[in-house]
Amino acid sequence: MTAGEDCRTILVAGTASHVGKSTVAAGLCRLLADRGLSVAPFKAQNMSNNARAVPVADGAPPAADPWGEIGVSQYVQARAARTAASTDHNPVLLKPRGDAESQLVVDGRAVGHYSAGSYYESHWADARDAAAAAHARLAADNDVVVAEGAGSIAELNLHDRDLANLETARFADATILLVVDIERGGAFASLHGTLALLPDDIRDRVAGAVITKFRGDRSLLDPGITEIEARTGVPVLGVIPHDDPGLPAEDSVSLPDPSERVVDGGQDGVPDAASVTVAVPHLPHISNFTDLAPLARTPGVRVAYQPLDAPLAAADAVVLPGTKNTVDDLRAAREAGLGRALRAFDGPIVGLCGGYQMLGDRITDAATESTADDLGAVDGVGVLPVETAFQPDKRVEAVTRELADCGALGGATGAVTGYEIHMGRTTVPDGVPQPVGPASAARGRVLGTYLHGLFGNDAARRGFRDAVFAAAGVEQPAPADTPDQSPSDAAAALVDAHVDLDPLGVPPAPDA
């Protein structure tokens, strides 16, 4: 079989959000790639503030900038598929910056900010064309495209404009694998109702369903599976146990409510008394919180997402994360007293992207970023001597930086890699240390940088860990054992062990 000939598209759709679509899709990508097939992930339209810088795809509309952005999940799935990520893997990205407005990104490039009504009325048709063209390019070069849907495939109010689900199924001629989560209860009712609400042409594409997040004795499900198959005519192709492979979360659905304090980490066997806590103020428009995942996996480190008005007294360090709306979130943080708390905090503080901008003295041209159009300038937290001006053009690029000694990173040095996605331009006065390359800044215990993925680098993560443990006066635990499997391999093992792929029409391996 030659790549591109009779390419099969499998659409991993769901009965709801957060049912495990991304995990199943990533598992399929790795499993099929390891069988010798050329595989590409795809999500026609994603809504997420977790984004990643990738090259603009060959064949995409030309642009001066060779870099664009896609959702983090599609980047992870591309790595799972053992292929280089590009903008074709997620051609339409919506990045919310308020309750009624999102930034539209098409083929990796920011187009503008629109309300839902404006997007659907004036831009959706072009977005659909871009998505269909991106899929066609992927299908021409691969044996299998593993497409991921969004939310529920049965949203009746969206059936005439559901780009990630119904439209993808149609223009990709996709076979659908329907994912239903049993952990929240009502799995059989959800599956039956979803199938009943699908248009006939879409329902006919459903090859089977898979139940995720199951705990307990698998055989206890058998009577329900037998009946749901009889009622719907759709086979249940597998039951995946509740076993998190450790893939990055796709969007804020996986985060706690902003009014709650929830700790990530703690599965390392290290007693809380021998651990340190990194507080992460839960900004209203938090973005790229996947930056914090490597810290939560570090032995002895607890990452605590907490309300803006929660005290920092129990924290040993603070990371102020990225945000899709720096100005509005800064105003919310100041009103909650977070600015005063940060100025009084005596442990390490790291600001990432929007969090870095907030730590500075001042932000100008604020209306470019805020949902309020009458702002000129706003004062920052004032713990870093920098100023940021927002501009209409966005910087998107994968970068390599050289670390220089700074307190917040425990004196770590060496090259680090990551990516930048931001519309602000930060001015750093002469004489202010820039330990993470141009436009970064440090003063005492505080560091600000635009580098997403900083803690994914061993040197930076270990340096920050060392600084936090030293500041807290806590002895570090012994290093943890390296996991036997990568998250992608773990996801593939779950799919391989628990899902029957034959009804999906997967092409045979090249040597089969």
UniProtKB/Swiss-Prot annotation:
UniProt keywords, alphabetically: Cobalamin biosynthesis, Glutamine amidotransferase
PROSITE patterns in the record: GATASE_COBBQ
Pathway annotation from the record: Cofactor biosynthesis; adenosylcobalamin biosynthesis
Annotated active site: 353 (nucleophile), 452
Keyword Cell membrane included in the entry's annotation: no
NCBIfam families, A to Z: cobQ, PRK00784.1
Known role: Catalyzes amidations at positions B, D, E, and G on adenosylcobyrinic A,C-diamide. NH(2) groups are provided by glutamine, and one molecule of ATP is hydrogenolyzed for each amidation.
UniProt-recorded name of the protein: Probable cobyric acid synthase
UniProt source species: Halobacterium salinarum (strain ATCC 700922 / JCM 11081 / NRC-1) (Halobacterium halobium)
Encoding gene (name): cobQ
